[in-house]
Regions:
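His/acidic/aromatic-lined binding-pocket segments of jelly-roll/cupin-type domains
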Residues: 87-88, 96, 118-121, 159-160, ...
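A short hydrophobic beta-strand segment most commonly corresponding to one strand
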Residues: 118-120, 177-201
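Transition-metal
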Residues: 1-139, 199-227, 251
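Short beta-strand segments in beta-sandwich/barrel cores
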Residues: 261-262, 278-283
Length: 289
């Protein structure tokens, strides 16, 4: 195997901005690009290899071809030919909807799908940009529905003004929303299931409001209240600092100032590198980039 690169899958959205195209140095005239799916095994939205002998193969093709060699023995035993993670960049010019994602058991029961635990890493943020994560006070499922109906659900959500480098872990069941001006990297389980709770009563280009999933979301929500929903860490020059470790992924951040060497020979898994700022080159032991 050699270091694999993938073609981005660009998604135009109602709320998309203009940061993704220049951030990725892409030659595209697309407007309102809200998401760039960097690595995806989602059906009908599969990433395509952009380099090397396997150029043109989809991620699903690669998993079928290389099996444990690509994803590791434990991952292949657990997920088979389904790639378990979805990596995105998200650029919000407007507030995204208030939403929640189901956990594995509920997603399997309702959709025959994985659940959706995820995390955010803030790449960039306009002045005053905010993220919402979790409840700021205890509410019941009945109160939740009442607040959705009377447009006050945002009053009981915890808001954070953000800056580059901020991290939030979002286990399935945690209500959340990305605010206008936020540009983030999102690491998540391979699932595109979203229960939209509140959408600020906005309308699309055809004058229609988007469907809400009030009752589906009510059963999926974890109503627990935490003191702080942010992930605290301190970056260390040229050393990995762990951000999140959960049953679905482990993430670390490198604040790089010089060339580093990483030995993954004993790791029974794949590794994904995301460059958040500046530029970098990745080479394997044979000099392949």
């Amino acid at each position: 195997m050699y270091p694999l690169k993938f073609e981005p899958i660009l998604k135009q959205t109602l709320w998309g901005g203009d940061k993704i195209i220049p951030f990725k140095h892409l030659n595209s005239d697309l407007k309102g690009v809200g998401e760039s799916w960097e690595i995806s095994g989602v059906e009908d939205n599969e990433s395509v290899v952009a380099n090397g002998p396997d150029k043109g193969l989809t991620l699903a093709d690669m998993v079928r071809k290389y099996r444990e060699e690509l994803v590791g023995e434990a991952n292949y035993a657990r997920f088979g030919n389904k790639f378990p993670l979805l990596i995105k960049f998200i650029d919000a010019k407007q507030d995204l909807s208030i939403q929640v994602h189901p956990a594995d058991d509920l997603a399997k029961k309702r959709h025959n799908s994985m659940g959706k635990t995820e995390m955010w890493y803030v790449v960039d943020a306009d002045k005053g940009a905010k993220l919402r994560s979790g409840f700021s006070e205890q509410i019941t499922p009945k109160e939740y529905k009442e607040r959705v109906l009377n447009n006050t659900i945002t009053d009981v959500l915890q808001e954070y003004e953000i800056k580059p480098g901020d991290v939030f872990f979002l286990p399935a069941g945690r209500v959340h929303s990305i605010g206008a001006g936020a540009f983030i990297a999102e690491i998540q389980q391979t699932s595109d299931i979203t229960y939209r709770i509140y959408d600020f009563n906005r309308k699309d280009a055809n004058g229609k409001t988007r469907e809400l999933h009030t009752d589906l979301a009510r059963e999926a929500i974890n109503y627990e209240v935490l003191d702080d929903y942010r992930t605290k860490y301190e970056a260390v020059k040229d050393e990995p600092v762990e951000l999140v470790a959960c049953p679905y992924f482990t993430t670390s951040v490198y604040d790089m100032t010089e060339e580093i060497s990483c030995d993954y020979s004993e790791l029974d898994s794949f590794v994904i590198f995301i460059c958040m700022e500046g530029a970098c080159k990745i080479k394997d032991n044979e000099g392949n980039e």
